[in-house]
């Protein structure tokens, strides 16, 4: 019998959305429980990451059974781009704006369990700010019954504005002498940036929120990978920043509860309401905890998705001929669509991206 390559094994593995949901949820819950045990934290302690994860999950899962039918009644259906994969056209009409229940469900337990920390409130506000920007975009799409929301320039200005105000608040709380000016790196290294840290922080917030937005293109993809990264950050920060770790795990639980309704075949999409908030929250956590390199590694999938779009657009423009048409590096960008058009099923792509994200999260401990 001929040996089977890794590529062939992945192509032959065809999980269901339900299998992916239960596998990811069980794995993240087990990892969070193990961290609690390692730190000798009881289940009902306010510092229990498993409690935060469970509460966020329960609230989002229950809320979804009420909100999803409501979104259907108000005809909050997704408009599918005609130039996208043809298999996605059957998703037209699936309710969007699912972030309106995933985000509050993930934030509420964090504020109850760790609300004494001003940083937790700041993280909650910046998450809600990006959710509001996303909601405005989603609402305009639904209102005009096409795939065009608010203008890209306005959207970007609002994202930069929210990032600037968040960083300004951090500076006001810490004072100019106490602000973060040095980035911690793996292997005990550090990089002194002085005040240049803050333009980098603003850029990180805007770019990460757009990166998660680009990743939100398949059932369960952004929600599952986002929950994994949030849980990974929570595990990383639990010993030194338990309040921020609680925020991470609570929001991770909210997205896992949302994933119950968003797994393939999706009953609801998170929309920009959820995807912009997800990226904004992850970036804000990395900024306040000064673990930008951890974000870069754990969220490597989001970076790859963004790079695939940048390369596709740049190459197309660079090779544009007299007829106005250029060449493409990928069949379609982002990367997940390239794999789809190459014959991969949605669940195969999602399973592979879950696995990649979990490997990247685990690799952080090797780099530390």
From Swiss-Prot:
> Which protein family is named in the record?
Belongs to the glycosyltransferase 4 family. MraY subfamily.
Membrane topology (UniProt): Multi-pass membrane protein
Q: In which pathway does it act?
A: Cell wall biogenesis; peptidoglycan biosynthesis
Enzyme Commission number(s) from the entry: 2.7.8.13
Specify the enzyme's EC class, one word: transferase
Cofactors needed by this protein, per the record, are: Mg(2+)
Judging by the UniProt lineage, the source's domain of life is: Bacteria
One GO biological-process annotation of the entry reads:
peptidoglycan biosynthetic process
Q: Which reaction(s) does its UniProt entry say it catalyses? A: UDP-N-acetyl-alpha-D-muramoyl-L-alanyl-gamma-D-glutamyl-meso-2,6-diaminopimeloyl-D-alanyl-D-alanine + di-trans,octa-cis-undecaprenyl phosphate = di-trans,octa-cis-undecaprenyl diphospho-N-acetyl-alpha-D-muramoyl-L-alanyl-D-glutamyl-meso-2,6-diaminopimeloyl-D-alanyl-D-alanine + UMP
Where does this protein come from, organism-wise? Answer: Synechococcus sp. (strain ATCC 27144 / PCC 6301 / SAUG 1402/1)
Q: Does the keyword Cell wall biogenesis/degradation apply?
A: yes
Q: Which GO terms describe its cellular component?
A: plasma membrane
Which gene produces this protein? Answer: mraY
Q: Which residues cross the membrane?
A: 50-70, 95-115, 117-137, 156-176, 183-203, 218-238, 242-262, 284-304, 347-367
Task: Provide the alphabetized UniProt keywords.
Answer: Cell cycle, Cell division, Cell inner membrane, Cell membrane, Cell shape, Cell wall biogenesis/degradation, Magnesium, Membrane, Metal-binding, Peptidoglycan synthesis, Transferase, Transmembrane, Transmembrane helix
| Compartment(s) where it occurs, according to its Swiss-Prot or TrEMBL record | Cell inner membrane
Question: What CDD domains is this protein classified in?
Answer: GT_MraY (cd06852)
Q: Which residues form a coiled coil?
A: none
Gene Ontology MF term list: metal ion binding; phospho-N-acetylmuramoyl-pentapeptide-transferase activity; UDP-N-acetylmuramoyl-L-alanyl-D-glutamyl-meso-2,6-diaminopimelyl-D-alanyl-D-alanine:undecaprenyl-phosphate transferase activity
Per the entry, what this protein does is: Catalyzes the initial step of the lipid cycle reactions in the biosynthesis of the cell wall peptidoglycan: transfers peptidoglycan precursor phospho-MurNAc-pentapeptide from UDP-MurNAc-pentapeptide onto the lipid carrier undecaprenyl phosphate, yielding undecaprenyl-pyrophosphoryl-MurNAc-pentapeptide, known as lipid I.
What is the protein named?
Answer: Phospho-N-acetylmuramoyl-pentapeptide-transferase
């Amino acid at each position: 019998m001929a040996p089977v390559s890794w590529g062939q094994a992945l192509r032959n593995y065809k999980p269901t959305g339900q299998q992916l949901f239960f596998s990811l949820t069980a794995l993240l819950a087990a990892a969070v429980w193990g961290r609690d045990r390692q730190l000798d934290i009881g289940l009902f302690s306010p510092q229990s990451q498993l409690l935060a994860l469970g509460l966020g999950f329960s609230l989002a899962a229950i809320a979804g059974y009420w909100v999803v039918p409501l979104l259907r009644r108000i005809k909050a259906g997704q408009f599918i781009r005609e130039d996208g994969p043809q298999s996605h056209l059957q998703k037209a009409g699936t309710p969007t704006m699912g972030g309106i229940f995933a985000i509050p469900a993930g934030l509420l337990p964090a504020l109850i369990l760790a609300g004494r920390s001003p940083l937790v409130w700041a993280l909650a506000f910046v998450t809600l700010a990006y959710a509001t920007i996303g909601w405005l975009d989603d609402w305009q799409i639904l209102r005009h019954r096409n795939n065009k929301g608010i203008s890209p320039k306005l959207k970007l200005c609002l994202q930069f504005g929210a990032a600037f105000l968040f960083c300004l608040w951090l500076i006001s709380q810490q004072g100019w002498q106490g602000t973060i000016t040095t980035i911690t790196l793996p292997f005990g290294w550090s990089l002194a940036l002085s005040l240049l840290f803050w333009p980098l922080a603003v850029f990180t917030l805007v770019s990460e929120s757009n990166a998660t937005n680009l990743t939100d293109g398949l059932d369960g993809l952004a929600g599952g990978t986002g929950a994994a990264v949030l849980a990974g950050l929570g595990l990383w920060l639990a010993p030194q920043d338990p309040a921020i770790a609680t925020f991470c795990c609570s929001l991770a639980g909210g997205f896992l509860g949302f994933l119950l309704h968003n797994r393939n075949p999706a009953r609801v999409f998170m929309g920009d309401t959820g995807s912009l908030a997800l990226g904004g929250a992850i970036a804000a956590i990395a900024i306040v905890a000064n673990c930008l390199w951890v974000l870069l590694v754990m969220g490597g999938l989001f970076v790859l998705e963004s790079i695939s779009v940048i390369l596709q657009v740049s190459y197309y423009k660079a090779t544009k001929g007299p007829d106005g048409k250029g060449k493409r590096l990928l069949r379609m960008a982002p990367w997940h669509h390239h794999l789809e058009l190459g014959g991969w099923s949605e669940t195969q792509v999602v399973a592979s991206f879950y696995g990649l994200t979990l490997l990247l999260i685990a690799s952080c401990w090797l780099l530390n």
